[in-house]
């Protein structure tokens, strides 16, 4: 798989970054679909995901949720390692390797960020950022079922990152139904924990917005553009939490 990814980047890297390929003009063609899908996701969140996340928040405290968040953040380090390598950031690749080893062992499977105390700060990046570096255009804004706000490049990047994750390899290498249930259960915990952590933020965005769809779209696009920009400048230390996107994420 990685050979295919490297080959794709090598070919696409020959292109030039044309501003005319931003896909902005195509957004309006998808507007009706996007709004309908946004409403579907909103109702799904309102009637299922948010109540579960609220119940979860009521039986946990901030310390516990931070340990869960830190555990899953640590599982993203191999993804950062691969993408930093693909971007030619050798130093950052080494830091990601070091962080994963240190935090998985001394940090109790990543529940504590011991590496940061040793000066090994997180060098977060994604395959989305890797494609951006090789001049692959973002494409139009689109809302996907359950996943939420996205773009074609973001979706490809998100999928590629998922394939690099230890969680994926745990699923693909397991023949046991019990093990699969454990992996799927922990994955569900990841997203419920993320939703609980972002509860106040999303409620505030909704209550202060005249048009929640437009506000969510604007927040998503601005956050990802800033994240991609900061990744290209190697300025990870200044990156705030961009796991705000309504799918996942993954928090810092």
Question: Across the structure, where does each feature detected by a protein language model lie?
Answer:
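Bacterial signal peptide processing site
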Residues: 18-21
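Positively charged n-region of N-terminal signal peptides that target proteins for export
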Residues: 1-4
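Alpha-helical transmembrane segments of multipass membrane proteins
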Residues: 51-55, 81-82, 142
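Mid-length scaffold segments of soluble, non-membrane domains
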Residues: 74, 87-152
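Post-signal peptide N-terminal segment of mature Sec-exported envelope proteins
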Residues: 25-48, 55
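C-terminal motif of bacterial Sec signal peptides marking the signal peptidase cleavage site
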Residues: 13-16
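A structured, mid-to-C-terminal "fold-capping" secondary-structure block
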Residues: 135-252
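A glycine-rich, hydrophobic loop/mini-helix early in the fold
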Residues: 62-88
């Amino acid at each position: 798989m990685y050979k295919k990814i490297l080959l794709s980047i090598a070919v696409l890297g020959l292109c030039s970054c044309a501003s005319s390929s931003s896909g902005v003009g195509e957004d309006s063609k998808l507007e009706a679909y996007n709004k309908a899908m946004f409403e579907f996701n909103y109702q799904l969140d309102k009637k299922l995901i948010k109540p579960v996340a609220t119940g979860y928040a009521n039986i946990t405290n901030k310390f516990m949720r931070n340990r869960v968040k830190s555990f899953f953040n640590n599982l993203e380090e191999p993804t950062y390692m691969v993408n930093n390598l693909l971007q030619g950031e050798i130093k950052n690749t080494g830091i990601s390797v070091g962080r994963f080893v240190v935090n998985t062992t001394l940090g109790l499977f990543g529940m504590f960020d011991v590496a940061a105390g040793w000066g090994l700060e997180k060098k977060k990046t994604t395959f989305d950022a890797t494609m951006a570096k090789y001049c692959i255009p973002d494409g139009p804004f689109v809302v996907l079922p359950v996943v939420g706000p996205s773009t074609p490049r973001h979706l490809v990047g998100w999928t590629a990152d998922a394939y690099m994750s230890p969680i994926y390899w745990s699923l693909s290498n397991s023949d046991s139904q019990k093990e699969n249930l454990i992996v799927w259960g922990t994955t569900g915990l990841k997203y419920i924990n993320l939703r609980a952590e972002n509860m106040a933020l999303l409620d505030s965005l909704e209550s202060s917005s005249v048009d929640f769809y437009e506000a969510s779209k604007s927040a998503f696009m601005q956050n990802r553009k800033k994240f991609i920009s900061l990744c290209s400048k190697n300025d990870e230390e200044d990156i705030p939490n961009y796991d705000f996107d309504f799918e996942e994420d993954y928090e810092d």
